[in-house]
Each structure stands twice: as C-alpha cells, then as structure tokens.
From Swiss-Prot:
EC code(s) of this entry: 3.1.21.10
Disulfide bonds listed in the record: none
Keyword DNA damage: yes
One Pfam entry name: RuvC
Role: The RuvA-RuvB-RuvC complex processes Holliday junction (HJ) DNA during genetic recombination and DNA repair. Endonuclease that resolves HJ intermediates. Cleaves cruciform DNA by making single-stranded nicks across the HJ at symmetrical positions within the homologous arms, yielding a 5'-phosphate and a 3'-hydroxyl group; requires a central core of homology in the junction. The consensus cleavage sequence is 5'-(A/T)TT(C/G)-3'. Cleavage occurs on the 3'-side of the TT dinucleotide at the point of strand exchange.
Catalytic activity: Endonucleolytic cleavage at a junction such as a reciprocal single-stranded crossover between two homologous DNA duplexes (Holliday junction)
PROSITE patterns for this protein: RUVC (PS01321)
Keywords of this entry: Cytoplasm, DNA damage, DNA recombination, DNA repair, DNA-binding, Endonuclease, Hydrolase, Magnesium, Metal-binding, Nuclease
Subcellular location: Cytoplasm
Biological process annotations from GO: DNA recombination; DNA repair
Full protein name: Crossover junction endodeoxyribonuclease RuvC
Length: 193
C-alpha cells in the first residue's frame, strides 16, 4: 500500500510518501517540505500548496492520503492556516478519487512511538528507525508527514484504503478504548466528590 502523509501548514507543509507491505515493513518513497512566504497574500500561499500537492499526487499516485486532523490550538491564526492548507490537500485528493484519512497528533505519536505524548524528537527517531534511514528527515514537518503515513498503514491494515468516515477494525478498538477510559475517569472523579 502506498500512503501519502501530509502535515499541513501555511508556512511549512510536510509531505511524505511510504510504501508499506503486508508484514508492516515500510520504505521511503519521497519526503519534502513545501514552504510559502508569510509575505505573500493568502491566496498565493494556498496556490503554492495546491500546485505542490497536485504535482506530488500525480507523481506518486498514492492509494490513500493521511492528513493530520486539525486539533485545538490556542493560536487562532495558526489553526486557520492549518485548516486552510488541509482543505486544499483534501480537495486535491478528492478530485483524483483518492481516499483521505485524518489522524490526531496523539494517535500518530502512539502508533509510531508507543506513547501518545511523545515529543518530536522521539517521533523523528522512530520514523528514522522504522524506515531504516541513514539520516533523520528534517525539518520536523517532514518527519511528521512520514509518521502520518506509517500510522495510517499500520492502523488500517494491509491493502486497506479506508477513509476518514470508514472505521477500520483498529480504529473501532481505539475508539472503544478511549470511551472506556473516559468513563473510568468520570467514574473516579464522581467517587472523589
């Protein structure tokens, strides 16, 4: 399965393409970061991302696109930029009939490092190890894009192109475990009162 991971952003958008075999071994196909100057108008910055994603999708023909899910951040302008970049990327995949999956940062960290609170250094180290790279991918946006691709392949299973709205067996188990953990936390909070 070929998975294209995208760590969206206006200033830096990380792209990473990996091939993952049925035995979960992963190999690097391509990695890069697309940048746009903050001095450009928003429309031009989004155009840079649009043209770049079009070129990467046409060159690498992924089975599925894995994008970091926009999560809560305190900086509203950062969230807006990430959401706008995500929209451009998702629309480009949709035009080509490529399935899109969204993964939260904690899901990616947990899948790649075993710890949902791992720092960027740990994620980069594990991506380097998983892909058997001699040099770590830089900057962090590139490593994050590769981590997204690996996460999707590992969570969805061999040959699956399940998109965001389709729950894979692994995703169902994850959601059930999260719900159970939340109930346990709520229950223990009530008992303390």
């Amino acid at each position: 399965m070929r998975v294209f991971g995208v760590d969206p952003g206006l200033t830096r958008c990380g792209f990473g393409v990996v091939d993952v075999a049925a035995n979960r071994s992963a190999s690097l196909v391509a990695v890069g970061v697309i940048g746009s100057s903050s001095e450009l108008p928003l429309s031009q910055r989004l155009l840079v991302i649009s043209e770049s994603i079009d070129q990467w999708l046409d060159t690498h023909s992924p089975d599925v696109l894995a994008v970091e899910r926009v999560f809560s951040q305190t900086n509203l302008s950062t969230v807006m930029g990430v959401a706008q970049a995500s929209g451009i990327v998702i629309a480009a995949a949709a035009k080509r009939g490529i399935a899109v999956a969204l993964h939260t940062p904690s899901e990616v960290k947990a899948a790649v490092t075993g710890n949902g609170r791992a720092d960027k250094i740990a994620v980069t180290a594990m991506v380097t190890r998983i892909l058997k790279l001699k040099v770590a991918p830089t900057p962090a946006d590139a490593a994050d894009a590769l981590a997204l691709a690996i996460t999707h392949a590992w969570r969805s299973g061999p040959g699956s192109t399940a998109a965001a709205g389709e729950l894979t067996p692994a995703r169902k188990l994850w959601l059930e475990a999260e719900a159970k953990a939340r109930k346990n936390v709520e229950k223990s909070s009530k008992q303390r009162r």
